[in-house]
């Protein structure tokens, strides 16, 4: 997440929730690019994602490497003047978290329908919740809604 001064968005005429996609200019063992949302929900925050093996590679190099990659990508589109607008930046290291192993759920092509099978409990003793099984997958609100739905199921099973 990058926080920019409001002048950045005005200077480049960026409207709220504009998508940003980087162009991959070279072939490598895996693509090196990012995508994001600028002026997220009309705030002065912009959010970016990298994925796959490249995300893991960046994490090994540390938070600064992820931030530098995104900033360099933005510089190639907006020029070096963006530096004067930057307030602060933060990158997560979810891939290093042993409980998550990453931060974005996705399904293999043609397999998204299998998310529904995760909504079923195992013998009404083990229940699953989270953004990966929500119809609003890859979102915090999807995780929240899924957790609430699962809590209701558990309450019914326990007859509370």
Regions found by a protein language model. Give the residues of each.
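Central beta-strand plus flanking loop segment that forms part of the substrate or channel wall
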Residues: 1-13
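Conserved flavin/dinucleotide-binding core of flavoenzymes
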Residues: 11-160
């Amino acid at each position: 997440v990058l926080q920019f001064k409001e002048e950045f968005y005005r200077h480049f005429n960026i409207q709220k929730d504009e998508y940003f996609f980087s162009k991959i200019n070279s072939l490598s063992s895996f693509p090196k690019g990012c995508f994001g949302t600028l002026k997220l929900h009309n705030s002065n925050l912009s959010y970016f994602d990298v994925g796959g093996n490249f995300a893991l590679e960046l994490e090994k190099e540390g938070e600064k490497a992820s931030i530098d990659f995104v900033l360099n990508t933005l510089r190639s589109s907006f020029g070096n003047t963006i530096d004067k607008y930057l307030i602060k930046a933060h990158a997560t290291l979810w891939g290093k978290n042993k409980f998550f192993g990453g931060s974005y759920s996705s399904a293999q092509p043609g397999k998204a329908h299998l998310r529904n099978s995760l909504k079923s409990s195992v013998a009404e003793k083990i229940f699953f919740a989270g953004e990966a099984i929500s119809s609003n997958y890859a979102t915090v609100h999807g995780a929240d809604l899924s957790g609430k739905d699962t809590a209701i199921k558990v309450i019914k099973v326990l007859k509370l």
